[in-house]
């Protein structure tokens, strides 16, 4: 009997979170509404899988990249507090709204969140939230190897959570074997090897706004596609100049959020995008039998 491999449309959402002037800095509700609008738009255009950038809710901690002296520490601590207060828990009100949007659109959603730990007050994770097409929380992946400046905020993910390797799970779904990694995890050989051994077919590559998107970040995602013979939906943010708060912390790196989202086939070819210097949703029809 000849096996039929899934064919469907994927979407990479290239957008920026909603940022505020001090003292608020973040607006998780406005960013959540923006995400739900994008999910519904992608669903109307036929997408079955929608991928967002790293820590889209409530935004990437750009301010941690430029901390130079303890003279800035007071503002930094306030930023940390606002970041925590605007970060979702799983499950929670934010996951309910994303789930409702996913159900309405009839698609899977993979979105980066700054996850707040409901059990340990003040603990945060750089996480991927996986949502199913019926609005259900499939699970989360908490970043295992924190990238340099993110150590100011994020706790390492635990590979023993729930059951061994549940934190780096490959989901066996009707659209294929789905998983994802965050940013610098694409540099970790053993993490990629785990996905390969588990038979990953469709990969969500979540990246922040960094200038190296045009070189290292793109190449590392392509390398995974070739190694695993999988598709990848790479999502990176774009923050327009007019969207940058006028009264904000001086050590910001918003200028690095230039986009770079794309879709990559199992041979490492870029088949959609990359999109730079604009918000938008990239689409491509993938064929897991390729």
Indicate residue ranges for each PLM-predicted region.
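Active-site beta-strand/loop signature of hydrolases that rely on acidic residues for catalysis
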Residues: 39-68, 102, 109-110, 185, ...
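A charged helix-plus-loop insertion that forms the helical arch/lid used to bind
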Residues: 63-87
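Catalytic metal-binding/acid-base residues of hydrolase active sites
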Residues: 16, 56, 114-115, 187, ...
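N-terminal active-site segment of His-dependent metallophosphoesterases
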Residues: 1-49
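Conserved hydrophobic/aromatic positions in well-ordered beta-strands
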Residues: 11, 129-131, 262, 282
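Active-site catalytic loop in hydrolytic enzyme cores
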Residues: 89-90, 94-100, 104-107, 115-202, ...
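Short beta->alpha transition motifs characteristic of CBS
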Residues: 58, 65, 129, 140-147, ...
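C-terminal beta-strand edge segments of enzyme domains
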Residues: 3, 231-290
